[in-house]
Design a protein with these regions (language model features):
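N-terminal glycine-rich dinucleotide-binding loop that anchors FAD/FMN and/or NAD(P) in oxidoreductases
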Residues: 24-59, 79-82
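Short hydrophobic core segments
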Residues: 10-12, 180, 204-207
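Short, ordered loop/turn segments at secondary-structure junctions
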Residues: 14-17, 29, 34, 179
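Aromatic-residue-lined binding/catalytic grooves and analogous aromatic/hydrophobic interfacial grooves
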Residues: 34, 57-67, 72-82, 99-100, ...
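Conserved redox-cofactor binding core of oxidoreductases
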Residues: 87-203
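Glycine-rich FAD pyrophosphate-binding loop
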Residues: 4-25
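Short Asp/Glu-rich motifs
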Residues: 20-22, 42, 141-143
């Protein structure tokens, strides 16, 4: 997004190739897509798991707001006599937060859940082709896992971005074999990062 807006972008890559672990991962992408997931049925077991999630003690203001939002969504779903698989970004956030034993930052978890469908759409606009249905991969909590039809692994995400950078001549520079070891803050905002090269040398990249 920043590069498309004309900003110069520097990407620190810990490994010697772009993408790191994502490139060798299975390629599944979890994102709430109610319309696509509606091809599946809402089993009694899945409904029970949602009801149990919504009965959890409220742990924060945002937690309570998300629970209330999903309750309202479910009420609308029930009013329509819904038998198809229910989902929403709020349910995705609640399930993800609980799966992490509530240790994560719920604000960030919610941003991740909201951003997943947006990035899915952006990837499609860049030429990434998604399968016409979702599934529930091993370890997932809900059948909202998406796969590509034109790639077999996570390398597809990286190749799509690299191709976009190349074809549109975006101002993106990669620094390989370098870990971003610290974030530099100024007035409560990220102002740069500290990079640690493979030989142990450290340097700063300022925004």
């Amino acid at each position: 997004t920043a590069a498309k807006a004309g900003k110069s972008v520097i990407v620190m890559e810990k490994t010697h190739y772009a993408g790191g672990n994502t490139s060798v991962a299975g390629g599944c992408y979890n994102a709430a897509d109610p319309a696509l997931e509606a091809k599946q049925e809402m089993s009694p077991q899945r409904r029970a798991s949602v009801d149990a999630l919504l009965a959890e003690p409220v742990r924060s203001k945002l937690h309570g707001e998300l629970i209330q939002k999903v309750k309202e969504q479910l009420a609308q779903y029930d009013a329509k006599g819904g038998k198809y698989l229910f989902d929403s970004v709020e349910l995705h956030a609640l399930q993800s937060w609980k799966a992490g034993d509530y240790a994560g930052n719920l604000d960030l978890v919610y941003e991740l859940a909201k951003g997943a469908p947006e990035m899915q759409k952006e990837l499609a606009e860049m030429g990434f082709k998604w399968n016409s249905g979702t599934e529930q991969v091993v370890g997932a909590l809900w059948p909202r896992s998406n796969r590509a039809s034109n790639y077999k692994s996570g390398v597809g995400y990286i190749d799509t971005f690299l191709n976009e950078i190349k074809t549109k001549h975006l101002p993106v520079t990669f620094i390989m074999n370098t870990a971003a070891s610290d974030i530099l803050m100024k007035d409560g905002r990220a102002a740069g990062v500290v990079g640690t090269a493979e030989n142990g040398r450290t340097f700063k990249v300022l925004a």
